[in-house]
UniProtKB/Swiss-Prot annotation:
Record-listed NAD(+) binding positions: 52, 137, 157-160
Protein name: NADH-dependent flavin reductase
Family statement: Belongs to the non-flavoprotein flavin reductase family.
This protein's record includes keyword Nucleotide-binding: no
Top-rank EC class of the record's enzyme: oxidoreductase
Assembly with partners or alone: Homodimer. 4-nitrophenol 2-monooxygenase complex consists of an oxygenase component NphA1 and a flavin reductase component NphA2.
GO biological process, one term: 4-nitrophenol catabolic process
Protein's organism: Rhodococcus sp
């Protein structure tokens, strides 16, 4: 095995782990929840620690820092939404990451009482079925109660930067 980024560090520090895991390209999601169907009650945050868990039953998982307000909000509401962002939604991602950039206007679509971002490629409205402590994060497992998806190119995050996704090979799905 050759090393290109430097020598092996025998100590696994949070910074080194973050840098290593940042080399795993991921989609970008906005996790949302609300106390009621009112845009003033919406709480959202950018997250890329999201994964599918099971197709039957339909389960997904999002990992939220225990220091984040979102962790408490999800526990209080028992629901959350996942909006998988399209390639042109970097300003929205920055907004929900707490950056100074403000998108022109954030609009929501409500599905099963859960706010989801207009213009996203995918909407998943979830009910929390389990929450597991995991170090400095909580793993919130959600049952997908309703979904919606569209075609388009996703927003991708790699090594701390947003990227575009270029298709390689044929532009045909694998049968799904």
């Amino acid at each position: 095995m050759t090393e290109t980024a430097g020598e092996l560090d025998p100590e696994v520090t949070p910074l080194h782990l973050r840098k290593a895991l940042g080399r795993f390209a991921s989609g970008v999601t906005i996790v949302t929840t609300a106390e009621c169907e009112d845009e003033d009650s919406v709480h959202g945050m950018t997250a890329n620690a999201f994964t599918s868990v099971s197709l039957d039953p339909p389960l997904v998982l999002v990992s939220i820092s225990t220091r984040a307000k979102m962790d408490t909000k999800i526990r209080e509401t028992g629901t959350y939404g996942i909006s998988i962002l399209a390639g042109d939604q970097e300003p929205v991602s920055l907004h929900f990451a707490g950056a100074a950039h403000e998108p022109d206007r954030v609009r929501f679509v409500w599905r099963r009482g859960v706010p989801l971002l207009e213009g996203a490629l995918v909407h998943l409205a979830c009910t929390v079925v389990a929450s597991h402590p995991a170090g400095d994060h909580t793993l919130h497992v959600g049952r997908v109660e309703q979904l919606w998806y569209d075609d388009g190119h996703p927003l991708v995050f790699y090594t701390g930067s947003f990227r575009s996704l270029e298709l390689l090979g044929r532009d045909e799905p694998w049968g799904f």
